UniProtKB/Swiss-Prot annotation:
DNA repair protein required for FANCD2 ubiquitination. Keywords: Acetylation, DNA damage, DNA repair, Fanconi anemia, Nucleus. It comes from Homo sapiens (Human). It is linked to Fanconi anemia complementation group B: A disorder affecting all bone marrow elements and resulting in anemia, leukopenia and thrombopenia. It is associated with cardiac, renal and limb malformations, dermal pigmentary changes, and a predisposition to the development of malignancies. At the cellular level it is associated with hypersensitivity to DNA-damaging agents, chromosomal instability (increased chromosome breakage) and defective DNA repair. Some severe FANCB cases manifest features of VACTERL syndrome with hydrocephalus. The modification N-acetylthreonine is found at T2. The lineage of its organism: Eukaryota, Metazoa, Chordata, Craniata, Vertebrata. Its main location: nucleus. It comes from the Eukaryota. GO terms for biological process: interstrand cross-link repair; negative regulation of double-strand break repair via homologous recombination; positive regulation of double-strand break repair via homologous recombination; replication-born double-strand break repair via sister chromatid exchange. This is Fanconi anemia group B protein. It is found in: Nucleus.
Length: 859
């Protein structure tokens, strides 16, 4: 960014751009509000934004900073934007020099925050004046040159440090990813003895005695001195701007552009010149990159003669030039999302407002305060020629992009059509309707999936229809509630379902009347089991879906007889609810909507693949009118907290669940029920005595608890709260009444009993699988023994027939013994398919048991 100083008799002025705003810094001996100037120096700042309606810059806000130095001469050195190491945010800064009579120079670096408040980030004193080579880098870090040495000071250390590298000049300084703060400049290098024996010319000595190097300020060592700029350019390069860097085989490769004394803009890539542009003016001094959108990148070059030009990066041709400028800024001034260049002309800094300027992106965006008085030649005479060279490739690229876009659109439309038809066919199949959605032409285009034969489709339909069951057999009731921003749908199943439940999924398919597509809503499932027993032993099973511990009894013929741990005696009645919780906010975009509730049950039968069963539970209808009237909204009346049992299950499904193991080595935990009933004002739910409903006013109201005291000194406490804040409040209240040296442990995977049962189940499954291996071997051994007995019987018949000829018995007996010995030495083999099936089952079961053991060990 190029900024020039405009100075009057009693003030100094600098401008820069930040987030689309123009910041005007003024250092004066007075206040804007005071008519008479004072002796106290004041630094003022004005934020100005461009108004697209009036096409002028208007003042947005102001700020000031008082400098308590009356007898000193103050001067603005520079201003720009750098990153603060504390936050990593780019903020505007300004450097001020203070000179006293004793030739002591003090420097201040002030950072401007969004509230127009200044913060002094760095201050230091020097015995000399910084005249050239002043740069401010991220940190902030100030770098300058004095005599033939370079120095820097950082806001992190606050100490002046000299650069150890013997640089004759520094062309670029900045931060490179993974390398930190680096310098790029010319460094003097020593010639070899052979080169010193020769007598090179002055020009050759100037060229080959210096080399461009990349120097790290952190490690204070040279990172690279190759693949930068060839030595032949060392005497003519005046300015460098690094575009990109990468490390290839531990070697730094750099892509950069450079300005030369020959009035050229040269592009270098890995030390090789790629493009050259002859600039229209002399003495170039700075380069800025402008992205005007649509892949149009420009290099905006500023000149000492108050001129500027724009060079197109793609063709490396001059696109525009301007004369008689005072400042060139690049930012998104009009808020279009792309960058523009702001050209301030010479007379624009003489008043409080910007009077003479132009904003352009070298395309459609053009704003000018005085278009007739600018005296600028925006484009060269060969502008049309350059345009004709560029437009045809762009048109070809656009045609290719449009063709690809059309193909992609057709592909997406076909996918959407197939998915829509599949959803509709699935819903019709679930509801028992005839599926007439597919035409004969569409059916001909369909191909079987996974390499199946065509005749297998009918078999699949028969199996699928068998898997769909009537909801009256398994589902007793369906209900739904609205809690805060969640929709809770619950399904009460019959007692027979829980005895064979391995894995369930409750899905919601949204059906819109005006659209044939069905949308699967994202849901969070939970299985809740509550006991209706009046005695205090809790039977709330905090189990995950599909994880029920069961006891497997091994029999000699390797058949499994299963009895589930969660199966209680007939006196212990248990209510089972399967819930699905989904976000309500996306559904509010519809005035009313309908969802089909589908229950999927996956069962694993012995020795077979998992079998899926589908149950259509019903439909959920909800509208904005129902929500506004509070028809399904869950509330807590003061006199009757739980009006319906569905409300209780909705709370258990939607609330945040936390499980804690409480252990008291020295004292019995008799105070837990006192805490629940007296301190927390809990009421026991009559239908489910294990659940406590908190009626304490405030944020505690509505919180649910379950307490299972396993021993007098240990128990499991489960808290269902609206959020974690309420949960922490409950724990804070609980700690006050617990005995001394009491321990609380968060059980992230649920209660310990559940994990123990799950561990037992997985170990027993592993034993069953291993027994199948031994049973296969036993089966082959049994067949072998039967063959031996048959062979023995045949030999006895032969011996009886030849009893009258005893002289021939001995050879046959020897032959029989030889055959037995031969068969006993034969290796017993199991078929390869059976062996692979058994080993796969063993690996799966062992993996599950190891996972369960790991969870249990982490408690």
């Amino acid at each position: 960014m190029t900024s020039k100083q405009a100075m009057s008799s009693n003030e100094q002025e600098r401008l820069l751009c930040y987030n689309g705003e123009v910041l005007v810094f003024q250092l004066s001996k007075g206040n804007f509000a005071d008519k008479e100037p004072t002796k106290t120096p004041i630094l003022h700042v004005r934020r100005m934004v461009f108004d697209r309606g009036t096409k002028v810059f208007v003042q947005k806000s102001t700020g000031f900073f008082t400098i308590k130095e009356e007898n000193s001469h103050l001067k603005i050195m520079c201003c720009n934007c750098v990153s603060d190491f504390r936050t990593g945010i780019n903020l505007p800064y300004i450097v001020i020099e203070k000179n006293k009579k004793n030739n002591v120079f003090e420097y201040f670096l002030l950072i401007l925050h969004s509230t127009n408040k200044f913060e002094m980030r760095l201050s230091f004193k020097l015995g000399y004046e910084m005249k050239d080579g002043l740069r401010v880098l991220n940190g902030p870090l100030i770098l300058w040159r004095h005599v033939k040495a370079f120095f820097f000071i950082s806001s992190q250390t606050g100490k002046v440090v000299s650069v150890s590298g013997n640089f004759s000049s520094i062309q670029w300084a900045g931060e490179i990813e993974n390398l930190g703060m680096v310098l790029l400049g010319l460094k003097e290098c020593c010639l070899s003895e052979e080169e010193c024996t020769q007598e090179p010319s002055k020009s050759d000595y100037a060229i080959w005695n210096t080399k461009f190097c990349v120097y790290s300020l952190e490690s204070q060592e040279v990172l690279s001195d190759i693949y930068i700029i060839p030595p032949a350019y060392s005497s003519v390069v005046t300015y460098v701007h690094i575009c990109a860097t990468e490390i290839i085989k531990n070697q730094l490769r750099i892509s950069l552009i450079a300005l030369t004394r020959k009035n050229q803009l040269i592009s270098f890539q890995n030390g090789t010149p790629k493009n050259v542009c002859q600039l229209p003016f002399g003495d170039p001094c700075a380069v800025q990159l402008m992205d005007s959108g649509g892949g149009n990148l420009f290099f905006v070059v500023s000149f000492i003669s108050n001129n500027a030009c724009a060079v197109w990066k793609e063709s490396f041709q001059v696109a525009a030039k301007w004369e008689k400028l005072s400042l060139v800024l690049i930012d998104d001034f009009i808020g279009s999302g792309t960058e523009q260049v702001l050209l301030l002309f010479k007379d624009s800094l003489n008043s409080d407002c910007l009077t003479s300027f132009k904003i352009t992106d070298l395309g459609k965006i053009n704003y000018s305060s005085e278009p007739s008085d600018c005296n600028e030649d925006d484009l060269f005479e060969d502008k049309q020629e350059n345009r004709y060279l560029v437009v045809p490739p762009l048109e070809t690229g656009l045609k290719v992009c449009f063709s690809s876009f059309r193909e992609l659109r057709q592909h997406l439309l076909l996918k959407e059509k197939i998915i829509s038809k599949s959803y509709k066919a699935l819903i019709n199949l679930v509801q028992g309707k005839d599926d007439n959605t597919s035409s004969a032409e569409e059916k001909e285009c369909l191909v079987p999936l996974c390499g199946e034969e065509e005749n297998s489709v009918h078999i699949l339909d028969e199996k699928l229809s068998d898997n769909f069951q009537d909801s009256e057999q398994l589902v007793e009731k369906i209900w739904y509630r609205v809690i805060d921003d969640s929709l809770v749908v619950g399904v009460k199943t019959t007692s027979s379902l829980k005895l064979s439940l391995n894995d369930v999924t409750l899905s919601l398919l949204m059906d819109q009347a005006h659209d044939s597509r069905f949308r699967l809503l994202k849901c969070q499932n939970r299985v809740i089991k509550l006991s209706t027993n009046p005695f205090p032993a809790p039977y709330l099973m905090p189990c995950e879906i599909g994880l029920e511990a069961k006891r497997v009894t091994l029999t000699p013929d390797s058949k499994k007889e299963e009895s589930f741990v969660c199966e209680h005696p007939s006196k212990k009645e248990c209510v089972q609810i399967i819930t699905a919780v989904t976000s309500l906010s996306p559904l509010l975009t519809f005035s009313k909507f309908c969802c089909t509730v589908l229950l999927q049950i996956m069962e694993r039968e012995s020795g077979n693949c998992p079998k899926d069963r589908y149950v259509v539970c019903g439909r959920v209808f909800l509208s904005l009118e129902d929500l506004s009237t509070g028809k399904y909204l869950l509330t807590f009346p003061k006199k009757k907290p739980i009006e319906h049992m569905e409300d209780l299950f909705a709370l258990l499904a939607a609330f945040h669940k936390s499980c804690f193991q409480i252990t008291s080595p020295g004292y019995a935990l008799n105070s837990m029920k006192v805490w629940l009933l007296e301190h927390m004002k809990c009421e026991i739910i009559k239908e489910f005595p294990e659940v406590y409903f908190c009626e304490r006013p405030g944020s505690f109201y509505g919180t649910l608890f379950t307490w299972k005291q396993r021993t007098p000194f240990e128990g499991i406490l489960i808290i269902y709260s609206r959020n974690q804040t309420v949960m922490f409040q409950c724990l804070h209240n609980l700690i006050r009444i617990l005995p001394i040296n009491c321990f609380l442990k968060n059980l992230k995977s649920g209660s310990e009993n559940f994990l123990i049962d799950n561990m037992a189940f997985t170990l027993e499954k592993e034993l069953v699988t291993l027994s199948s291996l031994s049973s296969a071997i036993a089966k082959h051994e049994s067949n072998f023994m039967q063959r031996c007995e048959v062979s023995k019987g045949k030999s006895s018949v032969v011996a009886a027939a030849l009893s009258d000829r005893r002289e021939n018995i001995h050879p046959y007996r020897k032959e029989l013994q030889r055959e037995k010995k031969k068969m006993l030495q034969t290796n017993l083999k199991v078929s390869g398919a059976l062996y692979r099936e058994i080993t796969l089952k063993v690996a799966e079961v062992q993996l599950k048991s190891d996972f369960a053991a790991q969870k249990l060990s982490n408690l």
